[in-house]
């Protein structure tokens, strides 16, 4: 242990030079400041390795002195602390980690100081130091950036606070006997249905179920770069397709199961044109979502009094990286599934290799299947769904349902020669047998069952191509 006390009357520059001289005899990679309360000289910053400091606010908000007073004066409901790399610009270095704490109505500066210290700094600072000790942090001093392996160093925040504002009170919740409301996250930069303006004045407001379905529909069509359309009912796709034109994509999506699409939510990933709008209003729909509309399309859509028309804006921004589900006593949080399938990474496990067309369809079906409730099965040809088996408690039942929907409800489509995607492994060969009976010729699934060999043997017996993700 070395103590380098500042002598009476000693200048800041002289004191920091003596600190550097003392440290020369040690091999170290990190300097941690705590309660130093002085701006470091440029000489110290240039000659010391990475230096960390903790600031009592969620930077870049409320930098400098009196952070707690600034927080209370601003009337915000959340503050916290920030561990950052020290740079020449005060409180502006790259952020390593942050910890949020709530602000209560009767708080004074002492209350806030204690809460930020004990609930924030005592959690965030050790976490940051541990990440450095584990070699998980890379600091680019020239670019003033920090990268942490796994974005969060492999850890979830020790505290998650919800800071949403009441956006609207709804007519009711999922059922008429339940009250309902929607809250808005003002920090969300991604296209979303909560902040989307409703363009047809006079139409009734969105319901709880409308919001739920609209969110699911929007998330599905964000998967695709080419013109895409989807129709959602009870948060499951009734159909989805990608095509050269938006109108063609909608037509193909609708014809998967027009019966189930009745009263559903339509999502489009291109500006809606008049041709597509004419198709949308040809049957009853609750909501249509798109990143813009032509004037001619709006003229068509707003003729329907109860069709809600939402403009979600550009779809190129993906800012939300976590999803969560409230449960009694807490909430489940997981990394958002933003991955796109890579056919080159598929593991072909059967004697027959999939064709290039089948690989393309596998990718499309796999992306669509992410938005189908499990147990989920998707039959697809080209880049359009043919039959969907959703939310079944056994996988073979989901296969049989997809086959039934394809045969009975699909218009001008057939499962003969189609590709099947399964959102989980097949525990037994019966799912493959049922798919073969429906005419399926290629399968994409995760694999991982103890009975994989039996399942692969069944696929080979039927002459199928099968790949594991």
What is the predicted role of each segment?
Residues 352-376:
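Short, basic/aromatic recognition patches
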Residues 192-204, 257-262, 335-350, 385-386, ...:
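Gly-rich Lys/Arg/Thr-decorated short loops/hinges at beta-loop-alpha junctions or inter-strand turns
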Residues 147-289, 293, 298, 304-306, ...:
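Active-site loops and adjacent core secondary-structure elements that bind or stabilize anionic groups
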Residues 1-153:
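One-carbon transfer enzymes
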Residues 83-85, 168, 230-231, 238-240, ...:
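Short beta-strand scaffold segments in enzyme catalytic cores
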Residues 269, 282-310, 428, 433-469:
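C-terminal binding/interaction regions
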Residues 239-258, 384-432:
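Glycine- and Gly-Pro-enriched alpha-helical subdomains that act as flexible
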């Amino acid at each position: 242990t070395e103590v380098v006390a500042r002598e009476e009357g000693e200048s800041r520059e002289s004191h920091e030079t003596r600190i550097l001289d003392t440290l020369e005899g040690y091999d170290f990679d990190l300097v941690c400041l705590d309660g130093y309360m002085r701006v470091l000289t440029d000489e110290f910053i240039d000659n010391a390795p990475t230096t960390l400091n903790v600031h009592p606010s969620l930077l870049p908000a409320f930098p400098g002195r009196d952070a707690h007073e600034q927080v209370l004066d601003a009337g915000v409901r959340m503050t916290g602390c920030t561990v950052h790399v020290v740079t020449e610009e005060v409180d502006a270095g790259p952020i390593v980690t942050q910890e949020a704490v709530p602000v209560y109505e009767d708080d004074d500066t002492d209350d806030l100081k204690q809460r930020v210290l004990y609930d924030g700094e005592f959690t965030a600072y050790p976490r940051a130091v541990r990440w450095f000790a584990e070699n998980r942090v890379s600091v680019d001093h020239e670019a003033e950036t920090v990268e942490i392996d796994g974005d969060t160093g492999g850890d979830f925040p020790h505290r998650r606070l919800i800071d949403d504002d009441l956006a609207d009170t709804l007519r009711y919740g999922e059922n008429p006997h339940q009250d309902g409301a929607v809250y808005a996250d003002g920090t969300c930069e991604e296209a979303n249905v909560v902040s989307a303006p409703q363009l047809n004045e006079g139409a009734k407001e969105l319901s709880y179920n409308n919001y739920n379905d609209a969110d699911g529909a929007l998330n599905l069509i964000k998967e695709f770069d080419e013109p895409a359309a989807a129709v959602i009912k009870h948060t499951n796709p009734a159909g989805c397709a990608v095509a050269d034109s938006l109108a063609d994509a909608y037509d193909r999506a609708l014809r998967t199961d027009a019966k189930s699409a009745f009263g559903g939510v339509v999502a489009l990933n291109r500006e809606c044109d008049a041709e597509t709008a004419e198709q949308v209003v040809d049957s009853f729909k609750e909501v249509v979502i798109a990143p813009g509309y032509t004037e001619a399309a709006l003229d068509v859509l707003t003729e329907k009094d109860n069709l809600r028309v939402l403009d979600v804006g550009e779809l190129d921004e993906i800012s939300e990286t976590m999803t969560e589900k409230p449960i009694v006593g807490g909430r489940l949080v997981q990394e958002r599934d933003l991955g796109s399938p890579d056919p080159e990474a598929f593991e072909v496990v059967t004697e027959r290799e999939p064709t290039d067309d089948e690989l393309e369809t596998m990718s499309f079906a796999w992306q669509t299947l992410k938005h189908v409730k499990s147990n989920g099965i998707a039959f697809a040809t080209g880049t359009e769904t043919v039959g969907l088996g959703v939310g079944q408690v056994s996988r073979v039942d989901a296969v049989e349902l997809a086959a039934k929907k394809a045969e009975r409800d699909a218009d001008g489509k057939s499962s003969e020669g189609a590709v099947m995607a399964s959102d989980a492994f097949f525990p037994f060969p019966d799912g493959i047998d049922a798919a073969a009976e429906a005419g399926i010729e290629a399968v994409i699934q995760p694999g991982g069952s103890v009975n994989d060999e039996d399942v692969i043997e069944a696929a080979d017996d039927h002459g199928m191509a099968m790949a594991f993700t």
